[in-house]
């Protein structure tokens, strides 16, 4: 019988809090030993009540088996607290999750300069631009951007990391198969393809409000620092910052106008001792001596964004030249659009009729898949490509490759 089944069984014991599960695991050594323990032995564990011991007498593994089967169907991996890939940083926090569900590729968090980027969902255009810039530049400088995939600041920072072709991770307050909020569906898929989606909740778990404060301890616990981009006085981002401080992590904040509601929380954090960040290197320089082979201050800067950019589909103000085919023309030699080298390679390879898999594009371009995913994401945002099925894209512009 798979040992994972017992891990799922233990984490699904709703009468037990995280500390109680942790105490049982430390006492018995494994969830399987907890499963087979006698009631009298359970009661010898400090903090375990008679009611909790009685609840553990329910030995059905049907729910656990169902969850494992669903994970297999949906390509979801499980990471236990005893797994070699489980981050030591997370083990060291109060109430570490015994089990993580994931989609994508799990980074070695202990070897990464990971920074949690958080802020209000009801953010200003300035907050969006700033979060995207920090996400982009932090990735270019070798950092790992971690966020919660919420609308607003979270989404903008992760979009910035994807634009940079960097790794990114999201910690969810629902199952990793649940897209929340729904408008982040493409961003959700791109994060899973370029990094990892993580949750302590099983597949299908809904985004209940009480999940998110619990999620925040994982978000900050995986990281060396938490950056608050924009936060009103009672923002949930301030809860994440407080949790980070309790975990002994660094906290940074971006200053804002004194009369801006979204800057009240950030300015207060700075007043109370948080690090002031006006550029991403203000944060990453703190960890350069620890990760000299990864972190460098000369990363590429994000090109200027329009004042009122949309996160996903900015409107284009100029009417482009139109080819006889009816498609807009993009001259990749002049590159007035400021495309990256990877984006230009993608446009040269893609067809305007036959969809091509990102894996095939990467093979032809001789570029890693995660960089191709970043390139096609940004090209789609700009309206130069269109997704046709799972990770298949077509070009929606005519490519001109001349100097004139």
Give short role names for the model-derived ranges.
Residues 1-85, 384, 389-391, 399-404:
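Short, small/acidic-rich helices and loops at N termini and domain boundaries
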Residues 2-4, 72-73, 80-404:
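Glycine-biased, small-residue-rich flexible motifs in mid-sequence functional cores and linkers
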